[in-house]
Amino acid sequence: MTPQPDSVVLDAKGLRALAHPVRVQLVGLLRKHGPSTATRLAERLGVNSGTASYHLRQLGAAGLVEEDTERGNARERWWRSVHQRTWFNDHELVEREPEAALAYLQSVAATYTSRTQQALNELQTMPRVWRDTFDMSDWPLRLTPEEASALYEELRAVMSRYRQDTPGAAAQAPEGAERFSVITHLLPEPDAPATSTGTDTGTDAGTDTDAGVERP
């Protein structure tokens, strides 16, 4: 499967630029909410504006965000995301930049965790109709690598059948449609022993991020 037109395929420079949780979150906020300033983004993340401004400049140098010159002025710079998705599946790059690759994935994982906590905090104030769609589950499986890859492709096929959250799709969405995010974690555990009890460990909830990693 190939990257979509609005995706950025991470190279070494982009990978190193995103190897920080604040930068992953900044890109996510710009993708989710549109152009913004360092001050406003800093308020959302709970950091000072100087920190946000520094990280935005680093992201800009890597080509992941850019100044929105139509909005900016001499007093305040506006920033926007250059892409809507992040594509990272370069095995050779991982071997060349193992520390940056790990730091990036750890940053993404931290962002997912933060978004999960945010969703949980918002759950009680959600309308009941949306609260009933909230889910957080896990299924321990015993698969071969080939079966795991097939599962991944099946999950992607299911997601592709639904309306994506893009500006064009949002304009044509039916009444009542809201942003709804799905995060998948496929976690190999090759050294885990076989379970003997057959206990179902499933739970129920759901998450969201805009700094997602895709792989073909």
Q: What is each stretch, according to the model?
A:
Residues 16-22, 37, 66-92:
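Short, cationic-aromatic polyanion-contact patches
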Residues 24-28:
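Pre-recognition alpha-helix immediately N-terminal to the DNA-recognition helix
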Residues 40-43:
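A short acidic, leucine-rich amphipathic alpha-helix
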Residues 48:
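Helix-turn-helix DNA-binding motif, specifically the short coil turn and the N-cap/start of the second
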Residues 63:
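Glycine-centered, phosphate/nucleic-acid-interacting loop/turn motifs that mediate DNA/RNA or nucleotide
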Residues 80-140:
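Amphipathic alpha-helical dimerization/coiled-coil segments
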Residues 125-216:
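Charged, low-complexity intrinsically disordered regulatory/assembly segments
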